[in-house]
Structure formats: C-alpha cells, structure tokens
Amino acid sequence: MLLAGLYFFLQPNLHAASGSSNVKFGIAPTSASARAMAHFKENFAWVQEVTWFNEPDNMYCVFHQGNMVNRVFYDEHGYWQYTLISYPPSSLTKTIKEKILNNFGGYKITYVNEIRSENYEPVYMISMENEDNIKIIRISGDDMQVKQDLKKG
C-alpha cells in the first residue's frame, strides 16, 4: 500500500509547483487538516516555505531543501502516511551508492526517490542507466530488486 499511487511522484523529471502559491507557517489553507499542519510544524519546523495540495482522499505538501524535493503525504483525516524525498545521486548515502555500483557495474545513477514511513526502514527507488539500458532499482534494507529494465532506443 505504501507504494500505491506513487508512480506519478516517482518520475525523475517531475518538479514541484511554482513558488507563487507558497504558504508560510500560520497561514494554513482552510481545507488543510489542522492535524496535518500540526504534524508538519512539529516535524519540519525549520521549513520556511511550503505548498499544500488537497486531493479527494489525501493531502500533501511540497517543499525544497537544497537540491532535494520533499513531499509529505497525509490521509484524508490528516494522519501522516509517508514522506517522499527526490534528489540527485550526489546526495545518496555512500553505503547505498556502493551497494548499487557493486551489483551494477557500468551503470550510472541518474535519480533517487527515497520513501520514509513509520515503522519501516527507508525504501529507495533508484533510476540508473548505461549506454544501452535504463533500470529502476528498489532497495529496502538488504533487499535489492530490479523493478524495471528497459532497452534504450
């Protein structure tokens, strides 16, 4: 269930909404749950600008942290579900990077999506490619799976 509905958000070329609708603390959108706002303020107090989005069955917010795009998802009642962090390979931990490159020599990591949720270790969805192929790898703990393996051109 954690990965359900994430396909749209795992696209490497997806960018957050423009800064024109940024919301500062204390100016919560009227449709955003007070519970979600309280959780966000408690866990991301350092964030200065955030954009909120409301969907029929959930809400989420987007903010930037350096070269990372953070998306924090809440259910329709305002309870935190997971956080999706997208970033370039330069921000990937050395341990994860080595694990990938030791198993996929000749590939270059192109983009990372990290999914954090309560009671689970982070899940990494990593895009990588070589001259002929594109792969999407899923890493969770010691488990590594090829989720997509595509031929170029």
Regions found by a protein language model. Name each.
Residues M1-S21:
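Bacterial Sec-dependent N-terminal signal peptides
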Residues S18-G153:
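Interaction-mediating elements
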